[in-house]
């Protein structure tokens, strides 16, 4: 008898209940297997076209992306989780509906850093799972080389929209995705087979036209849309280093962009998050371009210490504020 045999067994329902208790809005399970060739071919073509812009790390670990078992030898199941980060609009304004000259921040970034918050919550579940049944686990929160949205579809959480976001039917796309790879064999859920249908609102609403570059009707029908990061305001304001390309118009987008989500009809009735860590911080919402342009490294580090906004670094935030200020003066 092995150590694993001496441990108690748990049911899938018990595991899903545990995940719900730590804040997961929706969960599902997919069996670990290599990613199909057509998915890998589409991804490699996207890389070949340079649509990943300066995110060269996306070129790494292709074999691991193809076969998630390389992340955890012996893995049998991928437990996919969606965590709601959305806070509805209020009279004082939000990132989606700012008041006056309020800057636009990506909604997901206004609370605590989701990497830290979600990993801490999921660790409670993986510790319980390992102690209870002796199986190994690995938590992935947006940093491991794994096709998160593909596996979320396979686990039945939702479908990938034309804006390349995972859309949960009846709830929308304002969710963080995370996974638990485990050696515990679990019954897989049925993949989600829904699509955007005839709705193309996001394609024309994208301010940088990043969603409809070289897109054929067949690609739209097959949801093989190519998002060109070189034109995406989220990439340009967060990941891009150095000066912004000529012709970029940020408007009031200081960090990220939610335009393709705001226009999506699936987000009309997005539920409010119950996770306190994702509540928008007032000290961030009230920032002006003048406040940002006056920031030094200490102020930046203190304000964004436990925030995803630190990703852009002080230089990136100063650059964005400068561009917005210059555009305001021109207009």
Regions found by a protein language model. Give the residues of each.
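Auxiliary alpha/beta "docking" domains used to position bulky ligands
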Residues: 2-195
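Short, basic, low-complexity termini and linkers enriched in Ser/Thr/Gly/Pro
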Residues: 1-9, 90-99, 213-225, 326-331
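Short alpha-helical functional segments enriched in proximate histidine and acidic residues
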Residues: 22, 128, 132, 205, ...
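Iron-sulfur cluster-binding cysteine motifs and their immediate structural context
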Residues: 21, 201-216, 224-234, 240-241, ...
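Generic recognition of stable, solvent-exposed alpha-helical segments in well-folded globular domains
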Residues: 10, 14, 120, 124, ...
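Short, charged low-complexity linear segments at domain edges
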Residues: 166-191, 226-246, 296-301
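Long, well-ordered alpha-helical scaffolding segments within enzyme catalytic domains
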Residues: 193-198, 207
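Alpha-helical scaffold domains
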Residues: 235, 242, 246-331
């Amino acid at each position: 008898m092995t150590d694993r045999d001496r441990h108690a067994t748990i049911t899938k329902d018990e595991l899903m209940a545990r995940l719900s208790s730590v804040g997961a809005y929706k969960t599902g399970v997919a069996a670990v297997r290599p990613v199909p060739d057509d998915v890998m071919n589409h991804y490699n073509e996207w890389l070949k076209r340079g649509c990943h812009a300066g995110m060269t790390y996306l070129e790494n670990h292709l074999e691991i992306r193809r076969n998630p078992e390389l992340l955890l030898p012996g893995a049998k199941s991928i437990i996919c989780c969606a965590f709601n980060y959305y806070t509805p609009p209020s009279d004082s304004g939000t990132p989606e509906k700012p008041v006056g000259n309020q800057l636009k921040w990506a909604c997901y970034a206004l609370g605590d850093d989701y990497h830290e918050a979600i990993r801490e919550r999921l660790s409670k579940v993986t510790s319980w799972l390992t102690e209870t049944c002796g199986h190994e686990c690995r938590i992935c929160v947006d940093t491991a080389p794994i096709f998160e949205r593909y596996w979320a579809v396979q686990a039945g959480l939702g479908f990938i929209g034309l804006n390349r976001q995972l859309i949960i039917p009846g709830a929308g796309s304002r969710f963080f995705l995370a996974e638990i790879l485990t050696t515990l064999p679990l019954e897989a859920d049925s993949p989600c087979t829904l699509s955007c249908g005839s709705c193309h609102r996001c394609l024309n609403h994208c301010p940088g036209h990043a969603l409809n570059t070289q897109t054929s009707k067949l690609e739209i029908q097959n949801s093989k849309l190519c998002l060109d990061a070189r034109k995406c305001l989220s990439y340009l304001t967060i990941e891009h280093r150095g000066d912004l390309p000529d012709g970029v118009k940020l408007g009031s987008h200081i960090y990220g962009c939610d335009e393709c989500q705001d226009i999506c009809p699936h987000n009309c009735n997005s539920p409010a998050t119950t996770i306190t860590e994702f509540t928008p911080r007032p000290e961030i919402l009230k920032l002006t371009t003048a406040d940002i342009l006056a920031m030094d490294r200490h102020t930046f580090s203190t304000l964004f210490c436990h925030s995803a906004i630190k990703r852009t670094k002080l230089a990136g935030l100063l650059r964005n504020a400068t561009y917005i200020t210059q555009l305001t003066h021109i207009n």
